[in-house]
Amino acid sequence: MQSESSSIKVYFADEFKRNLRALSKKYRHIRSDIQPIVEQLQAGELPGNRIPGINDIVFKVRVKNTDIKKGKSAGYRLIYYVQMPTAIFLMSIYAKSEQVDISAEQILQIISQLNDAIIPEEIQDREGSDRPEG
């Protein structure tokens, strides 16, 4: 039996890209700091804590900021959304020192934007694969 985790795709929401670009100007190592989280997600792990009060499967992960030489609690917060077992979206990232928390409303707005955007071809192909051939 083939492992389902080998086909997990991690996508970057526009909001996440904007946040990452802004933070990378101040924190040079942010990309290498978040890489282990991306690898965990691709391996089928779901690190962090599920955010309560949201019906969708959304997690918040603490990520160490190696540029400030403090632990995870003072580092970044990475928010990701498990749209389906094979598609995970990195939705937002922020420095704990610059933003205390992200509201459920903000998260729902990002999810709404994702759902309104063009669905990646891989997802469309999988959703259409249950149609009978003929």
Give the positions of each predicted feature:
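Arg/Lys-rich, positively charged N-terminal/basic patches that mediate binding to nucleic acids
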Residues: M1-P36, E122-G134
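Short, charge- and proline-biased low-complexity linear segments
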Residues: R31-Q42, I93, E98
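Short glycine-/polar-rich loops that comprise or flank the Walker A/P-loop
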Residues: I8, D56-I57, M84-A87
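A short, surface-exposed loop/turn module that caps and links secondary-structure elements
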Residues: Q42-K69
